[in-house]
């Protein structure tokens, strides 16, 4: 299982940490990195390392989402339709995004 940075570690380790096995783990680590960077307590070097790690985590999460999307397309076949502008997703109901 992949090691995630604890609060006492440097911002993102030495840059050679393996990516997490799961999307949820990567997202949690990414959220933690963002919070630490927004806190402003990181040195410039740690901020750069955190940014690099964050970029790798974002790429991993995007890949995982693309894989799931492909699986959904296979399962749903031609029943998938583009999201129209009048759907609930654009009504502002989800403030967590």
Curated annotation (Swiss-Prot):
One MF term in GO for this entry?
Answer: exodeoxyribonuclease VII activity
UniProt entry tagged with the keyword Methyltransferase:
no
Using the UniProt annotation, give all residue ranges assigned to the region (Disordered). Answer: 1-22
- How does the record describe its quaternary structure? Heterooligomer composed of large and small subunits.
Q: Which NCBIfam families match?
A: PRK00977.1-5, xseB
Q: Which HAMAP family match?
A: Exonuc_7_S
Can you say what this protein is called? Answer: Exodeoxyribonuclease 7 small subunit
Gene that produces this protein: xseB
